[in-house]
């Protein structure tokens, strides 16, 4: 069974569909039952010879007991791949004390971006250890490698994922378990509020297919060739230039939001 969190939208949904295309049984985790039912139906309509299970979990509201119940359900099956995809971002770029929603939003971003990847990984590793086999894919972001003004908490939580996974690689390198970080740049999803795909901003289906092909070949990758090219080039760019790029990106996102409100 292959587990995908945040599995009913964007990259997560695309991961689930592509894993199903490859013939794997899927365990979907998301917060909205209607979307889970719809995604399960869509998968089975295309790939009727696989099994699809799901669990409802809102990671902004989940309690310790909720995590225990979820892990109990997950450990009832053999899990070959865990894709920790669920994530949350601010609606708009803003300095820390002015983030829309205030402390509630900041708490949600921290809870969604850090706790699931940590606790689900810890809860599923024992069965992978027993089999000496398993794959854990943690979805971060290139935002975790750049000091992104007006995205402070989001960027920091993505850095956590990168650091966390690199340590797991050291801890489990002799246990038959692959731990991989995916750090994409812009992907056309609802999270980034940008519906337009391009060669440098692929749609989620193209991205998921590409990134799944990197498993076992790279411990840390952007998951997509044009993203990797950009990421390697960024290493040679002075930080002052990167800051200007981030500022321009923030302005574009704000303009996009304003245009949506005018429609």
Curated annotation (Swiss-Prot):
Keywords: Lipid biosynthesis, Lipid metabolism, NADP, Oxidoreductase, Steroid biosynthesis. The lineage of its organism: Eukaryota, Metazoa, Ecdysozoa, Nematoda, Chromadorea. Belongs to the short-chain dehydrogenases/reductases (SDR) family. 17-beta-HSD 3 subfamily. InterPro entries: NAD(P)-bd_dom_sf, Sc_DH/Rdtase_CS, SDR_fam. Pfam families: adh_short (PF00106). One of its GO terms (molecular function) is oxidoreductase activity. This is Putative steroid dehydrogenase 4. Its EC number is 1.1.1.-. One of its GO terms (biological process) is steroid biosynthetic process. GO terms for cellular component: endoplasmic reticulum. It comes from Caenorhabditis elegans. The keyword Oxidoreductase applies. The active site is at 154 (proton acceptor).
């Amino acid at each position: 069974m292959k587990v995908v969190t945040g599995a009913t939208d964007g990259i997560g949904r695309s991961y689930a569909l592509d894993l199903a295309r490859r013939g794997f049984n899927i365990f979907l985790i998301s917060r909205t039952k209607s979307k889970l039912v719809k995604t399960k139906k869509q998968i089975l309509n295309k790939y009727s010879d696989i099994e699809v299970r799901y669990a409802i979990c809102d990671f902004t509201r989940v309690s310790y007991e909720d995590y225990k119940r979820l892990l109990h359900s997950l450990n009832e099956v053999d899990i070959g791949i865990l894709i920790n995809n669920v994530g949350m971002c601010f609606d708009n770029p803003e300095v820390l004390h002015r983030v829309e929603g205030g402390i509630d939003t900041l708490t949600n971003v921290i809870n969604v971006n850090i706790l699931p990847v940590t606790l689900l990984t810890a809860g599923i590793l024992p069965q992978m250890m027993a089999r000496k086999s398993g794959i854990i894919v943690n979805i971060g972001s290139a935002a975790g490698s750049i000091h992104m003004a007006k995205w402070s908490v989001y960027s920091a939580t993505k850095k956590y994922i990168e650091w966390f996974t690199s340590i797991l690689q050291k801890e489990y390198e002799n246990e038959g378990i692959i731990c991989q970080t995916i750090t994409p740049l812009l992907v056309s999803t609802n999270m980034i509020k940008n519906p337009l795909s391009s060669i440098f901003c692929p749609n989620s289906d193209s991205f998921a297919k590409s990134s799944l092909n990197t498993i076992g070949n790279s411990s840390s990758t952007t998951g997509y060739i044009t993203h990797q090219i950009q990421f390697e080039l960024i290493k040679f760019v002075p930080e002052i230039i990167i800051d200007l790029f981030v500022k321009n990106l923030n302005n574009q996102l704000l303009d996009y939001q304003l245009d949506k409100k005018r429609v």
